[in-house]
């Protein structure tokens, strides 16, 4: 980063996407055999923080994750992408957010999200991040948490 890099603060969610391809969506009570399973990081806020960093901004993420494997992987990802994690809170009471995505052969998807620790993002968390927010040139929020 350069001294004149923009500072971007992102308030948002982190979710792990668990994605499976299916020939068609199941109907109620039906099991459909899928293929091509993938697991990967996501969440609109997290994605924005990483994108800002990759574009040369000094990027900070403000959000909540669990104290589980997915939360550990999130911190590792952000640190490898040079996203500041000072304002990331870890929850012992809830899991890191996950999204279950099924995609049919036409490319349409159905998504179910278990937000977990994302739901603990509240005004107290935002107030504690105030110095980061005030120092930023840009604040991004997606209204999803």
Regions flagged by a language model, labelled:
Residues 92-94:
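Short, glycine-/polar-rich solvent-exposed loops and beta-turns at beta-strand/coil boundaries
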Residues 1-64, 69-76, 80-83:
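Glycine-rich phosphate/adenosyl-contacting loop at the front of the ribokinase-like
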Residues 1-14, 64, 72, 76-90, ...:
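Ribokinase/PfkB-type carbohydrate-kinase core domain
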């Amino acid at each position: 980063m350069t001294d004149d890099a923009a500072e971007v603060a992102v308030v948002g969610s982190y979710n792990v996407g668990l994605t499976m391809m299916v020939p068609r969506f199941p109907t109620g009570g039906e099991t459909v055999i899928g293929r091509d399973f993938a697991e990967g990081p996501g969440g609109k806020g997290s994605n924005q923080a990483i994108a800002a960093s990759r574009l040369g901004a000094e990027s900070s993420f403000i959000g909540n994750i669990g104290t589980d494997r997915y939360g550990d992987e999130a911190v590792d990802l952000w640190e490898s992408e040079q996203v500041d994690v000072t304002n990331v809170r870890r929850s012992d009471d809830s899991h890191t957010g996950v999204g279950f995505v099924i995609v049919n052969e036409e490319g349409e998807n159905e998504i179910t999200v278990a937000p977990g620790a994302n739901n603990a993002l509240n005004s107290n968390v935002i107030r504690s991040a105030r110095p980061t927010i005030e120092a930023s040139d840009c604040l991004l929020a997606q209204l999803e948490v």
